[in-house]
Design a protein with these regions (language model features):
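Non-heme Fe(II)/2-oxoglutarate
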Residues: 1-67, 71-73
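Catalytic core of non-heme Fe(II) oxygenases with the double-stranded beta-helix
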Residues: 52-163
Length: 163
């Protein structure tokens, strides 16, 4: 895997399993640092860990400093729902920081897109993902029809400013 290059991350069956998990779980209102102004959508935290070792190993092959992954998030977007331009970096007073962000398309919807500022990306297909730096501005646009569902993982490393 390389940063900013789409790749096949999940099989169709794995996407369907994550979709079923998300649809059968209680959804929360999406918030950023406790606020909902930047986004309007629904989320589910993916707490099953059966695939986590595989995902962690994938990130560690990219950078050995990766120690763990945060609980992944399943995000749901229907017409009128979106996540405006933002970054995934969190306050640097924590012992660990988000080192990489992975976003995967579980279900596409008409005109809904994941966009990275300063990068021209193709529309991701079901199971495709992209890995980028959390400091990169990105957003999820609203579908005009249907429901877009995405899956996000944050790979964590030590915050070197807290050593």
């Amino acid at each position: 895997m390389k940063l900013y290059e789409p790749f096949q991350f999940l099989t169709e069956e794995e996407c369907d399993q994550l979709l079923e998990y998300g649809r059968s779980s209680h959804k929360q209102t999406g918030k950023t640092l406790g606020k909902s102004a930047l986004r309007k959508n629904r989320i589910v935290w993916y707490r099953e860990s059966k695939w986590w070792p595989k995902w962690l190993m994938m990130f560690q092959k990219m950078d050995e400093s990766i120690e763990w992954i945060q609980d992944p998030q399943i995000s749901f977007y229907i017409p009128g729902e979106r996540y405006d331009w933002h970054v995934d970096t969190t306050p640097n007073h924590r012992t660990h920081i988000r080192h990489f962000t992975l976003t995967c398309e579980l279900q596409t919807a008409k005109n809904a897109r994941f966009e990275l500022q300063n990068y021209s990306l193709p529309k991701l297909k079901k199971g495709q993902a992209i890995i980028f730096k959390p400091s990169d501005m990105h957003r999820a646009t609203s579908p005009t029809f249907g429901e877009r569902v995405s899956f996000t993982i944050w790979a964590m490393s030590k915050n070197l400013t807290k050593s």
